[in-house]
Amino acid sequence: MSYNHKEIEKKWQKYWAKNNCFNTLDDPNKEKFYALDMFPYPSGQGLHVGHPEGYTATDILSRMKRAQGYNVLHPMGWDAFGLPAEQYALDTGNDPAEFTKKNIETFRRQINSLGFSYDWNREINTTDPEYYKWTQWIFTKLYEKGLAYEAEVAVNWVPELGTVISNEEVIDGKSERGGYDVVRRPMRQWMLKITAYADRLLEDLELVDWPESIKDMQRNWIGRSEGANVTFKVAGTEESFTVFTTRPDTLFGATYTVLAPELELVKKITTPEQTAAVEAYIEETSKKSDLNRTDLAKEKTGVFTGAYAINPVNGQEIPIWIGDYVLASYGTGAIMAVPAHDERDYEFAKTFGIDILPVIAGGDITTEAYTGDGPHINSDFLNGLNKAEAIAKMNEWLEENHVGKKEVSYRLRDWLFSRQRYWGEPIPVIHWEDGTTTTVPESELPLRLPVTSDIRPSGTGESPLANIDEWVNVVDPETGMKGKRETNTMPQWAGSSWYYLRFIDPHNKNEIADFEKLKRWLPVDIYIGGAEHAVLHLLYARFWHKFLYDIGVVPTKEPFQKLYNQGMILGENNEKMSKSRGNVVNPDDVVAKYGADTLRLYEMFMGPLDASIAWNENGLEGSRKFLDRVWRLIVDEEGKMRDRITTINDGRLTKVYHQTVKKVTEDMANLHFNTAISQLMVFVNEANKVDALPYEYVEGFVQLLAPIAPHIGEELWQILGNEESLTYVPWPTYDETALVEDEVEVVFQVNGKLRGKQNVARGLSKEELEQIAMNHEAVKEFIEGKTVRKVIAVPDKLVNIVAN
């Protein structure tokens, strides 16, 4: 007999919605628990079975914490701006707002069909003007503090998309979305000064409970390195340039320098003989993305400019080259090369016949670069010193001679914040005809995205908003001065950089959120999502949070106390699920056939939450069979509670019940859901072996199962005679003393040989044990007719009888 999942799931979903069961209780006297999912982008494809894995994990925690007496905040919303909706609108002629609205309805329906305990009164949508009013407000504050600025920067321009994309969205020289060619070109862009927060973004990783691998990814992305800036003069000119090096101690071994091809200086210093080669190389470089140019696996290429730099430590002239692996946007856009001690510089020098001079003893530079340590040689005042001593001495020398100084450099670049697209938050800025720029006054926010039927990219590098004259052109009512609105929009990262704050106070018309409420709910206690957001989203959100902390808007230094990345659910063939492979599993189909509780149970039982595991239909069937077994254990053929559930407790299930409460509670808290489910299975197996099922144990078991399989949990709770939902029924507790074995197995030996075993009460005296041993049938057989010489009894362990 199996239960009717369709009826039961519909019934309880209606009940929860009608009774607002999961509304957040904001009781200041209770402890809080804020469980957050990375909110989804509502795509046209709807939910896939990968989404519910993380959502089920936070839901189990939220349901358990409610029962444990916590105020639980468990919200859901939509990260709904972004390229896919715009691309769809361009392809079909439909309005991206309509498309997005429809997708959200599908997502919400699918999410509700899975029984998640979200507080829908707090639902947010990044495309709602009442929401993006505050995204724009944060931008104006960044602008006021000098952290939002305009700059001419070389950007990744994608002609087919008609927009600029960030470095992180370029994969192997192609756009991540669509796989189109990326071209480098200079454009006016809005930038956010995330570099001002580099040190704090690094240091404060110590404050949070995150996977070490994610912390390392952030550390590497920020890429802090200590070294020195060194100034090189260009021979025969007034020009000079600066290089950053982490090894100033090797300056005597610098035999050439390399400039980024796009530096203005290159054109000024290139000799007529080299002009054609240099220009051709610059043209070639403009077609490559930054990631492509800095790929460590590719061979270094370059062209000689014909000019020479003067090495400041020895006055020697060394050639100046250009190379695409040096970026104008990274460091100073120039490097010094010490080929004797760098493998790639060594290859380059060998290829182009450049001098190689060793300055650290220990290798054989006729065969390869030496990258180990050793005393300095060929280095004048550094000779004989080790690395640390030589770096310190060279830094002093550079400063004394005014040709360099100690410096800290970062890999992190400022955040390119503008997109030449329609479907994003308008940047609240006006450019006036007198050359000044102001932000839109706070009283006029939100600056709404105008409705238009023509969202094609302008093709000029400006966004489609540039085509809407009546929106773009403004006149200052006080002075009559004319101005134009900023036509770039914000990137999709903007709305997701602060959404966790709005969930705390989503209907506040006067501020992002009430400070007292923020004090009560922050930081987020558990944040679960995919590892693909390890760097960007988390770094951007931490940056905005720190800025808001500095201006007194939020009370904590960090937004997310604990972060957890769920693994990926792969297709049955162990490949990533994707439409093109045709291996995507739609949760609607699973819910229809097996039920939402089965899907939830299966995804939590597949393996550890952070592992990537292949989908398996057999596993689904196994999960459904377990729920049917639970149903049959408690419910008879007429749908009523079984007679064997009784108030009589013969003690046979006591130990396994208390073990189950302990293990399930601890495993759920530690996100070890697969082992929690295993323990529930152990209990069911034991319960099926006994005649009488104590009512209190069955109730407790149902409560433990309910966070994982909430619909069947509620139904069984009702069948057990309870009228109210079990949402807030106090969580079961276990008795430590019941976990202790009250019986032990004692071994009986005769003359040192095992002759029998028996379970006895724990803690019996030697005399009592001796008596039991002497009366044991097998022992009696072996001592019959013999004289007992000695009895050795070890309490709770053994009795050895010596007889002959």
UniProtKB/Swiss-Prot annotation:
Disulfide bonds: none annotated. SUPFAM superfamilies: Anticodon-binding domain of a subclass of class I aminoacyl-tRNA synthetases, Nucleotidylyl transferase, ValRS/IleRS/LeuRS editing domain. Keywords: Aminoacyl-tRNA synthetase, ATP-binding, Cytoplasm, Ligase, Nucleotide-binding, Protein biosynthesis. Coiled coil: none annotated. A motif ('KMSKS' region) lies at residues 576-580. PROSITE patterns: AA_TRNA_LIGASE_I. Gene3D superfamilies: 3.10.20.590, HUPs, Isoleucyl-tRNA Synthetase, Domain 1, Valyl/Leucyl/Isoleucyl-tRNA synthetase, editing domain. It holds the Pfam family tRNA-synt_1_2. One of its GO terms (biological process) is leucyl-tRNA aminoacylation. InterPro entries: aa-tRNA-synth_I_CS, aa-tRNA-synth_Ia, Leu-tRNA-ligase, Leu_tRNA-synth_edit, M/V/L/I-tRNA-synth_anticd-bd, Methionyl/Leucyl_tRNA_Synth, Rossmann-like_a/b/a_fold, tRNAsynth_Ia_anticodon-bd. GO terms for cellular component: cytosol. The keyword Oxidoreductase does not apply. ATP binds at K579. A motif ('HIGH' region) lies at residues 40-51. Its main location: cytoplasm. Belongs to the class-I aminoacyl-tRNA synthetase family. HAMAP family: Leu_tRNA_synth_B. This is Leucine--tRNA ligase. The lineage of its organism: Bacteria, Bacillati, Bacillota, Bacilli, Lactobacillales. The gene is leuS.
